[in-house]
Amino acid sequence: DCIEFEKTIEILKTLTSAAIDMKLGAILEDEIVDQMPKWFNSNSRSHKILIQSTLGGTKTIELICKKFKVEFTLLGEEEKLVNGISEVVWNHTTLHMRSRDKNWTYLQMLLPLNNELELISFLRKKWGRKVLWHLEAVSQQGSPRLAALPVLRWNGINELNEIMEDCKKLGAFIFNPHVLTVEGGGLGVVDADQVKAKLKFDPK
């Protein structure tokens, strides 16, 4: 649990560079946490840093949390839990939000390296609570990076495009889930293998 959103990013980046076998790393902004299932958000209203690692990594995670003066909670072994954190990350986050309000949608993006907070701060100032932040630790060519699956309040295609342009100008690489074409989804080019897969799996 962390009161300051800016600190959550610093903590997650510290964890991704530590000697931890980390299977999952994510951040959920407090207003997203409020919309998650009761088993997850009943203890406190704060931003959450979610980490899934091998048992050997838990001590290092706890020490890093102590260094940053944030509360550390060990949930236990994932396969033994009735509810695990994998149920509130990845696309599950948006699905939980949309189950309460269909006006929420989302984007996917790779955040600019070392300028993640600059982008988020700009969008928070301009768009306020229309954009809520869900971040995930990813690996790009072997290097730790932060990706975002922000949850957006839908207010039409023009506003969506403006938000995406703001992100691009600040260095984010957008994967737009609202388009039907392969080239519109992020790569910007037509990839033959992706087109074949799209023809195979798209509804007929």
Question: Which residue ranges define each predicted feature?
Answer:
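C-terminal substrate-binding/cap subdomain adjacent to the FAD-binding core in PCMH-type
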Residues: D1-W90
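Conserved glycine-rich FAD pyrophosphate-binding loop
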Residues: D30-E31, N41-N43, C65-K204
